[in-house]
Amino acid sequence: MIKLEKVSFTYKNRAALCDVNVDINEGEAVAIIGPNGSGKSTFLKVLNGILFPSSGRYVFDNNEINENTLKNNKFLKLFHKRVGFVFQNSDAQLFCSTVFDEVAFGIMQMGLEGEEVDKRVRDCLKLLNIEKLKEEHPYNLSGGEKKRVAIASVLAMNPEVITLDEPMNAIDPKGKRFLKELLIDLNKSGKTIICATHDFEYIEGVFNRAVVFSENHKIIRDDRYENIISDREFLMECNII
């Protein structure tokens, strides 16, 4: 479903990704692990078509994703319907005047009818347990509440692939447990989950695979999640713990 071939990304002459090769199949739950500055966020932004490889190829469902293909508005809308992104900083994706409007914004761009929009929004608000916040301004919410709104706005699009950048940040322990169970349920329903994280305590049982980035912005290990997390010597050598 997702294939990166020798992908590198350079920003202002500084490498952020180096020669990345990875395949992710439909329905997998993959943790993206690495020390700060190793390229995890850049990797997710490439997957979402926010950044484009400086070299190499990114192929999604047999279509190469680059600046030219995403200039096609029809293809762009379809791509962003199929691949959703929850940013590390929720403020970066919350801009509407109410929570209800925030969750409705993306699906309204898809041309859905009012009744369908209303149903999807209400279903997602209920799923994230934020129905009581529907008339609130997103900027007045706590960090954990903002994260739930951001996730609801992505789920309203019903994407096949859900990518998340450090979703446990700014969430209290109860919220982290809720999010863990949500990710497990979403994956069981067939969603592909790709998540950058360092919060290992709260994500046990979510992922079946982990991809590890090094401080040199390269993938240095791709293995079962349990094998990597149990290898404390490896994690310490990589400056992850």
Curated annotation (Swiss-Prot):
EC category name: translocase
Keywords: ATP-binding, Cell membrane, Membrane, Nucleotide-binding, Translocase, Transport
GO molecular function: ATP binding; ATP hydrolysis activity; ATPase-coupled transmembrane transporter activity
Subcellular localization(s) per the UniProt record: Cell membrane
Enzyme Commission number(s) of this protein: 7.-.-.-
SMART domains: AAA
Topology of this chain in the membrane: Peripheral membrane protein
Residues reported in the UniProt entry to bind ATP: G34, P35, N36, G37, S38, G39, K40, S41
ABC transporter domain sequence ranges: 2-241
Main location: membrane
GO cellular component terms, semicolon-separated: ATP-binding cassette (ABC) transporter complex
Recorded family membership: Belongs to the ABC transporter superfamily.
Physiological role: Probably part of an ABC transporter complex. Responsible for energy coupling to the transport system.
Name by which UniProt lists this protein: Putative ABC transporter ATP-binding protein CA_C0773
The species this protein was found in: Clostridium acetobutylicum (strain ATCC 824 / DSM 792 / JCM 1419 / IAM 19013 / LMG 5710 / NBRC 13948 / NRRL B-527 / VKM B-1787 / 2291 / W)
